[in-house]
Amino acid sequence: MSDVALGVNIDHVATLRNARNVDYPDIVEVANIAVSNGADFITVHLREDRRHIKDDDVFRLKNSLKVPLNLEIAPTDEMLSIAIKVRPKCVCLVPEKRQELTTEGGLDVKRAFSYLISFIEKLHTYNIDVTLFIEPDVDQIDQAKKLSADNVELHTGKYCNNTTQSELSQVIKAAEYCYQRNIGCHAGHGLNYQSAAIIAKVPYISALNIGHFLICESVLHGIGTSVHKMKKAIASAPN
């Protein structure tokens, strides 16, 4: 049985709510249902354009959840200030483009290295763990290690869009390299029941972040049932 943790991203609950600019579905209620059905932590992405999650959502979740909050943000001064006020268990730094539908790829840690040094140091000052969302690439992992990041999250989008052995091998290689460099390894983006079960089998990956697929499934089956089924899919993967 796999002990890989499941992080449920609830951004698109807010997307549905914001479609009519109302106060339902309540994001805290949905998060708590996910937790009661096996979610080990809750993830939200506070984007600069606030297209789904709003500032108030983040504070409400932090004050209400009985599991850790993983806050995804772009590495900007505004977002740093918010993260310090919220004090989530973990901040995951992601790249952002205004016109993208979703995060399109990993953070270029090497390119942003000089800026990220002080950014990560400040988060660590407030005992906030730092994860960097990156492509499954050993050079990016090396840079993350130099920055003293606690974890990386491997972008699985390319594998999910093109489920070849070559793409899977990149994830496997990167996860093993994380172990060698003594940096935590998570994975996420584009995962469904089948691909999550496969990625959960990869040695040294300790957590998966899954959002859009689960929210879509919840329209048909409810958030509790969908999270429970995902938890079972992950647990079915052998250690």
Swiss-Prot record:
Active site: H45 (proton acceptor), E72 (proton acceptor), H189 (proton donor)
Domain of life from the UniProt record: Bacteria
Subcellular location: Cytoplasm
One GO process term, biological-process aspect: pyridoxine biosynthetic process
Pfam families: PdxJ
Keywords: Cytoplasm, Pyridoxine biosynthesis, Transferase
Assembly: Homooctamer; tetramer of dimers.
The protein's name in its UniProt record: Pyridoxine 5'-phosphate synthase
